[in-house]
């Protein structure tokens, strides 16, 4: 389901996030925060929470049948506020 290699593992780990946490945040009722095209590739930033309670932004793209995580990092205050507003007030971007 997920596509990992040396490059995206390095980017995720540089932010102190494990691949398992990134996957978990995506799968646990994540919210699409914004979308953009980078070098002809459609990317979506998702805000989500791990089972341990960590709030992450996960930027990913669909490649065939797999999801490729580009990077993942902890939500900042503004992103966390937006996450709660969208999640609990139904105001999605």
Locate the predicted segments by residue:
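Ribonuclease/tRNase effector modules and their secretory precursors
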Residues: 1-93
């Amino acid at each position: 389901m997920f596509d990992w290699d040396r490059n995206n593992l390095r980017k995720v780990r540089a932010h102190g996030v494990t691949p398992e946490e990134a996957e978990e945040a995506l799968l646990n009722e994540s919210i699409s925060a914004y979308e953009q095209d980078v070098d002809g590739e459609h990317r979506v930033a998702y805000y989500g929470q791990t089972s341990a309670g960590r709030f992450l932004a996960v930027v990913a793209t669909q490649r065939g049948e797999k999801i490729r995580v580009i990077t993942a990092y902890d939500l900042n205050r503004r992103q966390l506020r937006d996450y709660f507003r969208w999640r609990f007030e139904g105001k999605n971007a």
